[in-house]
From Swiss-Prot:
Gene3D superfamilies: 1.10.1750.10, 1.10.8.60, 3.30.300.180, P-loop containing nucleotide triphosphate hydrolases. Residues 103-122 are annotated as: Disordered. The lineage of its organism: Bacteria, Pseudomonadati, Pseudomonadota, Betaproteobacteria, Burkholderiales. Residues 341-460 are annotated as: Domain IV, binds dsDNA. Pfam families: Bac_DnaA, Bac_DnaA_C, DnaA_N. Keywords: ATP-binding, Cytoplasm, DNA replication, DNA-binding, Lipid-binding, Nucleotide-binding. Belongs to the DnaA family. ATP binds at residues 168, 170-172. Domain I is involved in oligomerization and binding regulators, domain II is flexibile and of varying length in different bacteria, domain III forms the AAA+ region, while domain IV binds dsDNA. GO terms for biological process: DNA replication initiation; regulation of DNA replication. It comes from Janthinobacterium sp. (strain Marseille) (Minibacterium massiliensis). NCBIfam families: DnaA. Its main location: cytoplasm. GO terms for cellular component: cytoplasm; plasma membrane. This is Chromosomal replication initiator protein DnaA.
Length: 460
């Protein structure tokens, strides 16, 4: 077990950025392996859910290769890990109360002491993520075109560039591609790719060590700043304040800022209006879920990278049944390859059906009101219980109305039946919600995009 985890950790450390590895993989702990089932523990629910959605496929693939057989990887919650991994606080530094992140995850902020290292090493850019390796389709062609324009003219075109969309659609790939091209054109340029969570940690570290002068000196001196998943800034006032200063300094100096988020800027919960207005001052582009032809192209390209041949029929079958995002396609491909190698079979549609039977059964499930409520709640980051509660703040009322609209559009339920499933509400309340969201969809591109993403997710 220990040998496996060392192998798995080493592999992931090579593939991920230092921030990703430190934030998501390092806190995990392998528990046991028995009868083809591997159990891995996470210290809290947030990390557990994130690891399951982002890294489960890769860990499963590494495990299958290590044991030379299909492995069922299960992630479990073990809060004891959080307390076990907290460092002892130095007597000379008092613990700091912060609503940003706990002090136990602090990492050193970058300093000028590392300026002798190569620019690419400091940038945290993944060299594998380039424009050449990015599969383009209707869903992302505008985002790619904007990214290329920015890469060719950093600081003068679309500043800031704000890319938003669901998980696994290629936003991170695009911003790394920009960084790679800018570095290729000018190796001396000062670039930093950073996940929003790591930026939060840098702010806390500066606060703890009274090092905001060094913090500002570093971030304000960049030529290109790439911030991934900025929705993590929501509700963190000191982080937002410092980022606002950095934003203003970089824009004034005609330096380029590129930002990604899982949602449209105005929909980010807990984000300062000043920042939202700054985000809107540049170019905001949606990255949509890939269409069928694009999904096929992605599968065929990934298969070539894995050194296997995928027939068009097999690629179309997989792409037709798995529609949500690129990461899901990559995970499915790994499962197919592991199954094919273990059983010594060529990759046919029948083999794919066997390898992906669990995934396909989930995709083929009927849409229910309960599933709509859960999907919408996850999308807007609220509790499912809020769907049938009496709460009426805007951040709850609107998602509830959207869920009612989707229930009317995607199920056979009557208005009274839908109302009953939303906390016993009257059918006129449901009718009002349906009409309101339908009207908003016709007038607002943002609303139409939200509904499109939700419908694609629900239909699988």
């Amino acid at each position: 077990m220990e040998n496996f985890w060392q192998t798995c950790s080493a592999q992931l450390e090579q593939e991920l950025t230092p921030q990703q590895y430190s934030a998501w993989i390092k806190p995990l702990a392998p528990l046991d392996y028995e009868d083809g089932t591997l159990r891995i523990a996470a210290p809290n629910r947030f990390k557990l859910d994130w690891v399951k959605t982002q890294f489960a496929g890769r860990i499963t693939s590494i495990a299958a290769q290590f044991w030379d057989m299909p492995v069922d990887v299960q992630f479990v919650l073990d809060p004891r890990l959080a307390s076990a991994k907290k460092p002892t606080t130095s007597a000379s530094v008092a613990p700091i109360q912060s609503d940003d992140v706990p002090a136990s995850v602090l990492e050193p902020i970058p300093s000028n002491a590392t300026d002798h290292t190569p620019r690419r090493d400091q940038s945290r850019i993944n060299t594998a993520l380039t424009f050449d390796s990015f599969v383009t389709g209707k869903a992302n062609q505008l985002a790619r075109a904007a990214a290329i324009q920015v890469a060719n003219n950093p600081g003068s075109s679309y500043n800031p560039l704000f890319l938003y969309g669901g998980v696994g659609l290629g936003k991170t790939h695009l911003i790394h591609a920009i960084g790679n091209q800018v570095l290729a054109d000018n190796p001396d340029v000062k670039i930093r790719y950073i996940h929003a969570e790591q930026y939060v940690r840098d702010v806390v570290t500066a606060y703890q060590r009274k090092g905001f002068d060094d913090f500002k000196r570093y971030y304000h001196s960049l030529d290109l700043l790439l911030i991934d998943d900025i929705q993590f800034f929501g509700g963190k006032s000191r982080t937002q304040e410092e980022f606002f200063y950095a934003f203003e300094a970089l824009i004034a100096a005609k330096k380029q800022i590129i930002i990604t988020s899982d949602t449209y800027p105005k929909e980010i919960t807990g984000m300062d209006d000043r920042l939202i207005s700054r985000f809107d001052s540049g170019l905001t582009v949606a990255v949509e879920p890939p269409e069928l032809e694009m999904r096929v192209a992605i599968l065929l390209k990934k298969a070539v990278q894995e050194g296997v041949t995928f027939s068009d029929d097999v690629a179309f079958f997989v792409a037709k049944h798995l529609r949500s995002n690129v990461r899901e396609l990559e995970g499915a491909l790994r499962k197919i390859l592991a199954y094919s190698r273990f059983h010594g079979k060529d990759i046919t549609i029948e083999v794919v059906k066997d390898a992906l039977k669990d995934l396909l059964s989930v995709q083929n499930r009927q849409i229910s009101v309960e599933n709509i409520q859960k999907t919408v709640a996850d999308f807007f980051n609220i509790k499912v219980a809020d769907m049938y509660s009496k709460k009426r703040p805007a951040n709850i009322a609107r998602p509830r109305q959207i869920a009612m609209y989707l229930a009317k559009e995607l199920t056979q339920k009557s208005l009274p039946e839908i109302g009953e499933l939303f906390g016993g509400r009257d059918h006129t309340t449901v009718l009002h919600a349906v009409r309101k969201i339908a009207a908003d969809r016709g007038k607002s591109p943002e609303c139409n995009h939200e509904l499109h993403v939700l419908e694609q997710t629900l239909k699988g």
